[in-house]
Structure formats: C-alpha cells, structure tokens
Amino acid sequence: MNAAIHVQGLNKTFSNKSALLDLALSIQPGEMVALIGASGSGKSTLLRHLAGLACCDRSNGGQVQVLGREVQSSGRLNGQVRRLRADIGYIFQQFNLVNRLSVMDNVLIGCLGRMPRWRGSLGLFNREEKQRAMVALDRVGLADLAAQRASTLSGGQQQRVAIARALTQRAEVILADEPIASLDPESARRVMEILADINRQDGKTVVVTLHQVDYAVRYCPRAVALKGGRIHYDGPAQDLSKPFLNDLYGADEDASLMITERSRRVRQKPRLVLAKV
C-alpha cells in the first residue's frame, strides 16, 4: 500500500537556524497521527510543508509526497500544487474564516479547488455543492447556523465550521494545526471527537498537531514527537511516558500537558455519531 504521506530528507532553514533536520516520515492511508512537541519544535512547519504552504531548502531540501503525488522537492513546489491541495484539507489554529461571510458561504469555499475559477470567483455554487455543504454542517452540529455571520460564532463553533469546510472539500488528507489550542475543554473535546469520527467512519488520513498530550493519547493511536526539528519519538501514543515527556517538553512544563491515568487506561470513544458526506 502506498503511503498517504511520505517525507524524505526534509530540511528547512530560517535565518541560518534549522527548523527541520533531515526529517523522514511515512503515514499510511486511514491513520490518525498526533504531532507533539514543545513550541518551536517544528510541528507547524512540518504541517505547512505537507500542504505545500511552505517550501523546503533548495539545497538538499528533501521531498514531500501526498497520496502518491509530489508536493515539493528541493525547494520547488509541484506546478500542479493547487490541484493537489484539493485533496488536502487544512484546518488552522485561528480558524481562517471570512468573518463577514455567512457560515454557509465559508463552508462552500471548500468547493473552490474542484471547480472552474470563473465560477468560484462569481460565487456560482450549484445545488449539489450547496447540499454537500449543508450535510457537512449537519455533521458538525451547526446546520441551524448556516445563515449566520461567521463573526458571531464562538471559537469552538468557528473551528467546527473549518472542519465542515474540509468535509465539503472532499479532502482525503486532513491536516489540523493546533485546532484546539485556544478552545475551552468542552469545545476542544468536541472538535477532537469530530476529527476522530471522520478518521474512523470515512477512513480519512488525519494529522493533527497538539500541545495537549492528553488529547493525543485519547484520540490518536500514533504519536510523532518532534524536538529541535527532528523526530524524537514515533510510536503508539499510549506508550508515551512521563519521563519521556519531561525530556521532550522540559521538567518545568505545565502539568496539564502530561498524561492522566484515565487517558492511559483507555482512549475515549467518540460520543458523536456522524453520517458520511
């Protein structure tokens, strides 16, 4: 089976400082993987390279492939990267919604990568696309807010709109960059349950960067830990130990990042039951 994501020898330098160092990673179709690590470890940088939103170094920069297609190699993006991004849903930490638009219009933006530019620029979405967007909103529990302006939503609701947009996009790979970093515990739980259900029910490959190890253990079978731009651990999330995490984050890191006994005993099963889009 071809890997959903394949990274080989990836290097990225910012102002003579290495952000990613000879990084190699392979993720199989249908996996849900947590990228963990302290701030500045390279998590978000790696995710942006997977989506073709950033370029690796031109000299020995390495290669990134998604769904068997080259996204970039040695500092050059694939000329068809826009078409490739149609299969990659990207969920940003700060929601990345257009506040003046309605919830529905924000979700319909997910259709743009698979439609002619002229139709997208005019906002001419057909009935099937609108129905798909409404089904996606229903999945995340926001169908009744479709006509509401995005700016009026809470942070948790806005993040769920971003997930609905990725569903409408029909992305095969979903990359979520710190999707719960600014959310309250209940909103964070709901967002992670939705992502986990999309992974399990639809078989989508989901890669999520997390600062909260508790959530990585609870929802992601596999964890990849980065430190100084290198992979420091790659294995079962439940095997992460407190001594290892002390080394990864530093002994003085906030205790909320550590694994609770409940998380270690059993990964919580999602409570939401979602229909496929």
UniProtKB/Swiss-Prot annotation:
Specify the domain of life of the species encoding this protein: Bacteria
Pfam families to which the protein is assigned, alphabetical: ABC_tran
Give the EC number(s) under which this enzyme is classified.
7.3.2.2
Per UniProt, the keywords (alphabetical) are: ATP-binding, Cell inner membrane, Cell membrane, Membrane, Nucleotide-binding, Phosphonate transport, Translocase, Transport
The record lists the catalysed reaction(s) as: phosphonate(out) + ATP + H2O = phosphonate(in) + ADP + phosphate + H(+)
Gene Ontology molecular function, alphabetical:
ABC-type phosphonate transporter activity; ATP binding; ATP hydrolysis activity
- Name the positions where ATP binds: 37-44
| PROSITE patterns named among the record's database cross-references | ABC_TRANSPORTER_1 (PS00211), ABC_TRANSPORTER_2 (PS50893), PHNC (PS51249)
Tell me where in or outside the cell this protein is found.
Cell inner membrane
What EC class is this? translocase
Instruction: List cellular component terms (GO).
Output: plasma membrane
The ABC transporter domain is annotated at 5-253
Instruction: Output the InterPro entries linked to this UniProt entry.
Output: AAA+_ATPase, ABC_transporter-like_ATP-bd, ABC_transporter-like_CS, ABC_transpr_PhnC, MetN_ABC_transporter-like, P-loop_NTPase
Q: Which cysteines are joined by disulfide bonds?
A: none
Membrane-protein topology: Peripheral membrane protein
Subcellular location, principal: membrane
Family the UniProt entry places it in: Belongs to the ABC transporter superfamily. Phosphonates importer (TC 3.A.1.9.1) family.
Functional note: Part of the ABC transporter complex PhnCDE involved in phosphonates import. Responsible for energy coupling to the transport system.
Q: How does it assemble?
A: The complex is composed of two ATP-binding proteins (PhnC), two transmembrane proteins (PhnE) and a solute-binding protein (PhnD).
PANTHER family registered for this protein in UniProt: AMINO ACID IMPORT ATP-BINDING PROTEIN, PHOSPHONATES IMPORT ATP-BINDING PROTEIN PHNC
Q: What is this protein called?
A: Phosphonates import ATP-binding protein PhnC 2
Q: Which organism is it from?
A: Pseudomonas syringae pv. tomato (strain ATCC BAA-871 / DC3000)
- Which gene is transcribed and translated to give this protein? phnC2
